[in-house]
Amino acid sequence: MITNIVITGCSTGIGIETAKYLKERMITVYPTAREQEDVNKLIELGFENALLLDVTKPETIANVIEKVLQKDGKIDVWFNNSGYGQMGAVEDIPTDVLREQFETNVFGLYEATTQVLKVFKKQGYGKLIQHSSVLGLVALPFRGAYNASKYAVEGLTDTLRLEFANTNIYPILLNTGPIKSDFRKNAIESLDKIDTENSDYKQKYQEAKSGNSKKVPFSLEADAVASIVHKIILAKKPAPRYYITKATYILGYAKRVLSTTLLDKLLLKV
């Protein structure tokens, strides 16, 4: 029987590229997006199984699960890919902006996770792929909200892995580094949600908005993530964690071997 996968956050970038990659390899893909306009675009691209899903609206998650089960009678893999990065110094981020970051990156992911786990438990198997980040391993300045959200995803998924040990249900973390997509552009646009004009970091924000900030090294194309997702689908027993991009390997290794003081010095140079 052909394997199927539900992917959240397929309007652009990693989500849509992963959907294309898997479809080309005969995986039944259910790409989702939170706006009907984007769902229509997916359908125009040949994804007849495209569905509307906004992780901040539990009823849309339930609707997708119901439709997939009606059509296939199972869900093999669920990829929680939705998310965005809120930029800004911690002191500049209003509580409601931090809360908004968590609504998508943490609470939305959590809602999708708990709903699909009920399906996995009933059918006795399933692979749950959680899109974390290199910033779920280490922190960077002006990424506090995003860092906090991904650290939360790490904690939830590490716990799930222990709770589902010795079963055929596999919670899996992707620690992705810099990928060529709209993610960084969207992160810079998120600065509009904070008061950059009256901040001590006004100049840094202006540099980010003007595109004059430091270029991101070791960036890969979105299919670097897609190929790992495909590897997970094919694996009988997938690894609990996958590093993607050299930056993740370098910083992940640095966190294991360096003291906190030395790691901080390294991260301030990134």
Question: Where are the regions a protein language model picked out?
Answer:
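Conserved glycine-rich cofactor-binding loop
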Residues: 11-12
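A short, exposed helix-loop element centered on a Lys and neighboring polar residues
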Residues: 113-114, 158
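Residue(s) in the substrate-gating loop at a strand-loop-helix junction
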Residues: 133
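Active-site helix of classical SDR
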Residues: 113, 149-152
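Substrate-binding pocket helix/loop in short-chain dehydrogenase/reductase
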Residues: 89-90, 97-99
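The beta1-alpha1 cofactor-binding region of Rossmann-like NAD(H)/NADP(H)-dependent oxidoreductases
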Residues: 53-63, 95
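C-terminal beta-strand-loop-alpha-helix "lid" module of Rossmann-like NAD(P)-dependent dehydrogenases
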Residues: 165-215
